């Protein structure tokens, strides 16, 4: 039976670059909301020698995620899931929409794919270094736990927290940071839950990356660039390689942690470049 790698948000950016770093003997399934973008990415992967398929999926819809998991499992044994689907504050949408896609979408992906995965497989949830700059008083893990038991209360409480910011963009920024802080927490929780099934779970937090989404955030997120070790944005291919490496089965002892891949900007801001 062939091994299958699923990448949500795989039609472009770091998700597509991660697909290009996977072994060519794997079947690659990329998903997203725009079929034309996915089809273009599939053609690009096929030209490189991959057996690749496109499947539309809205990760904020559990049934859509379930259909993706079922489809992937019909192609072979699902060994790698890289959940890179997400939205940022600069994109169209509301605070609740950001939380539904980034936070609840992660819950749906982890829960539905864990049902079709076997020992020796891995889920990599993509977070963001914005998870590390969130004021501590906004972080409430009891609220995070509601994501699995009471979704609407979970959303209402996090939207309320994000409303503490002034201005629409800032409120969306708080919602984004909350959603990504949740992803880090939830991936760790799943690591210990799914570890009993032999499924490894890790999160990876990029910094500002030169993708379409990253460029939208450059005006505000760019403030962190001077704090990075090389004082630059990350490149999609660098993050793609990092994701593929973390998702590699040979990295079997890497679980229950967040891999901070932001050029050192979080460390620089907190410890070494405070005067910049």
Q: Can you annotate each of these PLM segments?
A:
Residues 9-13:
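Conserved glycine-rich cofactor-binding loop
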Residues 25-40:
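Conserved glycine-rich Rossmann-like NAD(P)H-binding loop of the short-chain dehydrogenase/reductase
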Residues 45-63:
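Rossmann-fold cofactor-recognition segment
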Residues 84-89, 264:
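Conserved NAD(P)H cofactor-binding loop of Rossmann-fold oxidoreductase domains
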Residues 88-91, 122-196, 208:
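Catalytic loop of short-chain dehydrogenase/reductase
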Residues 108, 175-176, 203, 220-254, ...:
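C-terminal helical subdomain
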Residues 132, 205-216:
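Short, flexible catalytic-loop segment of classical short-chain dehydrogenase/reductase
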